[in-house]
UniProtKB/Swiss-Prot annotation:
Annotated source species: Saccharomyces cerevisiae (strain ATCC 204508 / S288c)
Lipid bilayer topology: Multi-pass membrane protein
UniProt-listed InterPro entries: Prenylated_rab_accept_PRA1 (IPR004895)
Subcellular location: Golgi apparatus membrane; Peroxisome membrane
Phosphoserine PTM sites in chain numbering: S18
The protein's name: Prenylated Rab acceptor 1
Family membership noted in the UniProt record: Belongs to the PRA1 family.
TM stretches of this protein: 84-104, 129-149
Misc: Present with 5500 molecules/cell in log phase SD medium.
Domain of life, per lineage: Eukaryota
Pfam hit, one: PRA1
Length: 176
């Protein structure tokens, strides 16, 4: 019964999509992409060096996480897409669940009438759960998520700790 409640919450979430919400999300995405740094700046090998101590690592990471935040978000997004494309079963389960919820919501609470009988909405959600959960376990979402977290952390924190800060910021820190 708890799973049906969770599915009902997801269905309410999908009903909250409107053109205004989509437009506002698109505008926020555009503003985020406007802060994207150029590849020449992001992959500037002349600014890569080994930090002297852990304090410098912390300083570099703090600065670079703010400065390259859009680039890091793009890297995490690309890694997420790569993860789904290499785990096709997980992608199938996600598409199945989303399509199932959207399809059930299109019924608007009415029964689905088939030649095999009529099915109520809660029966359809139960059937979706009974199919998606076992296949979802086979798709190994936990190991995929852990790989994504690890690959993202190594990529982002590796770049942030090795990329030097601009010289101007070093002088600003000393005067404070």
């Amino acid at each position: 019964m708890n799973q049906l409640g969770a599915l009902a919450q997801v269905s309410r979430f999908t009903q909250n999509f409107s053109m205004e919400n989509i437009k506002s999300e698109f505008q926020s995405l555009q503003s985020k992409l406007a802060t994207l740094r150029t590849p020449q700046e992001f992959f500037n090998f002349k600014k890569i060096s080994k930090p002297q101590n852990f304090g410098e690592v912390q300083s570099r990471v703090a600065y670079n996480l703010k400065y390259f935040s859009s680039n890091y978000g793009l890297i995490i997004g690309c890694l997420s897409i790569y993860t789904l494309l290499t785990n096709l079963l997980l992608l199938f389960v996600i598409v199945l669940v989303v399509a199932g919820i959207v399809g059930i919501n299109k019924l608007k609470g009415e029964e689905l009438v088939t030649p095999f009988g009529s099915f109520k909405t809660n029966q359809l959600y139960t059937g979706l759960v009974c199919v998606a959960v076992p296949i979802g376990f086979l798709a190994s979402p936990i190991s995929t998520l852990l790989w994504l977290i690890g690959a993202s952390a190594v990529s982002v924190f590796g770049h942030a700790s090795l990329m030097e800060k601009p010289i101007e910021t070093v002088f600003d820190e000393e005067t404070v």
